[in-house]
């Protein structure tokens, strides 16, 4: 007769998947819990069973605690509440108790097309509408969610459980917070930004008039800019003067001075191109110093090279047109910075601007009259 083999772990450790200490008659876990330690027979006599009967037998060997059967109470007994139960305050209402003869509520079949709109809402927007008091189709089934404090019976509560006043949640206080505009970043005002741009444009224009590229060799041995380079640079400078005098930005004391200096430098370069010497630009000792010198060269229109007389006629017309445009900008400058619109006394800055613009106007008018006289006489130079 073969010896009966028992399992290596007790039934409790095997059922809970815990390693057993395999002590007899009680393992450490059963001794700590005060349970009876029981070792079942080992089923490993041969190959393990392929069916699920072995698993069912393991589960059946586990001890089952006794279960108390509680009788099912009728619906009326569940709805009734003992008198000694305290009534705790709540912000949600208690639904009315159903009558014994009330019919059990059945949810409607959503697949049925004949379902009434009162039992199944057709519109699902009520789920996302947080401000409406009741949803369409559920107003008759859902009671109001606001219970006032006077309808609740007074109760004596412990200090450990404070009672908060029951009141409805009003979203009107949060509407102002939601409608607030987003905070705008701290950026400089447009007038200050435009003023910086105008100062940069005036400085760059004046530098271009002083640092004109000198690539051609003059008869004196020095290098100077050519006629076409001078005409191109001065045309861009006249356009910059128009932008500066028409800008409505806030200008400091020195920016108007810089603008009128740029205008005077443009007139000096055009006089050098047209070979016009202004007698009013000399020094007290009668000497004149001209820094604006250009190198004469033939003018080309594409592949066609103009002769000397036609080239001078074209240069006079180009210079006269640009000086007339510059004269318009100087007049705008005079009205804006040198004349007092209120009729009062002119400030010191206005007097300074008026003296500077007066000098530029006299030089500009002298050059324009000289060019117009050349064109009328038919002698280009």
UniProtKB/Swiss-Prot annotation:
DNA-binding residues: 10-37
A cellular-component GO term for this protein: nucleus
Residues annotated as signal peptide: none
Gene Ontology MF terms in the entry: DNA binding; DNA-binding transcription factor activity, RNA polymerase II-specific; zinc ion binding
Location in or out of the cell: Nucleus
GO BP annotation list: aflatoxin biosynthetic process
Keyword list, A-Z: DNA-binding, Metal-binding, Nucleus, Transcription, Transcription regulation, Zinc
Location of the region described as Disordered in the Swiss-Prot/TrEMBL record: 41-88
A Pfam family this chain is assigned to: Zn_clus
Main location: nucleus
Compositional bias (Polar residues): 50-59, 67-80
Function in brief: Transcription factor that regulates the expression of the hps1-dma1 gene cluster that probably mediates the biosynthesis a derivative of cyclopiazonic acid (CPA). Further studies are required to whether the CPA-like hps1-dma1 cluster is functional or a non-functional relic reflecting evolution of D.septosporum.
Name this polypeptide is given: Hps1-dma1 cluster transcription factor tfc7
